């Protein structure tokens, strides 16, 4: 109902109330047919008055209603409770005092107003006790962890040194997937599941960790992770390359522990010396090939005769390719 309609209704009711007062004071004819007609006329008069004054009163009434809606909940509760107690007590006292000579409706009205004012004043003094419990804010920010990063396990060390700020969220469907892996008959899947659960235990000791029971929309686990991270305004931590690409499409911030590890790996420079296991021969004559811990290939000139041996080599050249860095080296002096 619009505010203007409330004004019309209020003035119509005022007209009916005025008719009742005039009847009680004997200022209207007491004929039943005329009483009904006079009530109708006064109600219509009130309605017409409302139509005339409504546009002017609407703005002021809207401002008052807006102010009432902005009142703290504890003030509304205290005022309502105080008014109710005051009115109930006024009804009781009016019933008891009705037989007292000289006690009129005016006295009853004044008594009611006084009691309501008194109990509202008292209730507002204790409004802190009527304060409603504030709803727990929905979690925001932090990091959402997926299955791949838990199975990897390095996220626990990263969190332990403080590189993952904010709360860590593990969706219940990710935990369920880890449990399914841990109960698998496949030894490899079972080992992954148990490693993921062990990572969770270490994470609880390193950072605030909470299992989210929320089930976001989406059919696949990847879609649920993306929607959940977006709803929480959180970053998604994953080692899944396809999921990282989907996160960019969905506009979700994504972090990769694998990318962090690659960024922090020591960078070999020309002239550096290292021990390298020669695994196979290279494409060119007398070349041997070995690999660093991060998978980078090292081609050793004159290293073919050391196949199957770990020797000391000196880096002679480093090339950046699309798939990573490629190093060239030669056996150090004294290599056997």
Curated annotation (Swiss-Prot):
GO terms for molecular function: metal ion binding; nuclease activity. Residues 1-23 form the signal peptide. It is found in: Membrane. GO terms for cellular component: membrane. Pfam families: PIN, TRAM. InterPro entries: Nucleic_acid_metab_PIN/TRAM, PIN-like_dom_sf, PIN_dom, TRAM_dom. It is a multi-pass membrane protein. Residues 267-328 form the TRAM domain. Keywords: Hydrolase, Magnesium, Membrane, Metal-binding, Nuclease, Signal, Toxin-antitoxin system, Transmembrane, Transmembrane helix. The keyword Hydrolase applies. CDD domains: PIN_YacL-like. The chain crosses the membrane at residues 34-54, 75-95, 106-126. Gene3D superfamilies: 5'-nuclease. The keyword Hydrolase applies. Mg(2+) binds at residue 222. Its main location: membrane. Its EC number is 3.1.-.-. Residues 144-255 form the PINc domain. Its cofactor is Mg(2+). Part of a toxin-antitoxin (TA) system. An RNase. It comes from Thermus thermophilus (strain ATCC 27634 / DSM 579 / HB8). Belongs to the PINc/VapC protein family. SUPFAM superfamilies: PIN domain-like. This is Uncharacterized PIN and TRAM-domain containing protein TTHA0540.
């Amino acid at each position: 109902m619009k505010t203007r309609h409330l004004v019309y209704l209020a003035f119509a009711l005022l007209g009916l109330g005025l008719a009742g007062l005039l009847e009680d004071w004997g200022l209207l004819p007491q004929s039943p047919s005329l009483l009904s007609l006079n009530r109708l006329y006064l109600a219509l008069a009130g309605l017409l008055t409302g139509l005339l004054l409504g546009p002017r009163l609407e703005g002021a009434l809207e401002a008052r209603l807006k102010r009432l809606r902005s009142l703290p909940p504890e003030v509304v509760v205290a005022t309502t409770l105080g008014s109710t107690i005051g009115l109930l007590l006024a009804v009781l006292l009016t019933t008891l005092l009705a037989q007292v000579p000289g006690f009129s409706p005016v006295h009853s009205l004044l008594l009611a107003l006084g009691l309501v004012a008194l109990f509202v004043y008292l209730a507002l003094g204790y409004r802190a006790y009527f304060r409603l419990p504030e709803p727990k804010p929905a979690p925001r920010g932090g990091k959402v962890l997926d299955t791949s990063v838990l199975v990897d396990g390095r996220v626990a060390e990263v969190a332990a040194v403080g590189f993952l700020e904010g709360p860590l969220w593990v969706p219940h469907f990710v935990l369920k997937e880890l449990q399914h892996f841990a109960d698998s008959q496949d030894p490899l899947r079972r080992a992954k599941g148990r490693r993921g659960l062990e990572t969770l235990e270490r994470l609880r000791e390193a950072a605030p960790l909470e299992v989210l029971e929320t089930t976001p929309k989406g059919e696949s686990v990847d879609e649920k992770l993306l929607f959940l991270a977006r709803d929480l305004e959180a970053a998604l931590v994953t080692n899944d390359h396809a999921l990282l690409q989907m996160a960019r499409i969905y506009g979700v911030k994504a972090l990769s522990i694998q990318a962090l590890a690659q960024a922090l790996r020591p960078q070999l420079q020309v002239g550096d010396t290292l021990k390298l296991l020669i695994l196979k021969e290279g494409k060119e004559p007398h070349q041997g090939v070995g690999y660093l811990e991060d998978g980078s290939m090292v081609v050793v000139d004159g290293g073919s005769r050391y196949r199957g041996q770990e020797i000391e080599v000196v880096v002679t050249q480093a090339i950046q390719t699309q798939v990573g860095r490629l190093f060239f080296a030669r056996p150090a002096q004294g290599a056997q």
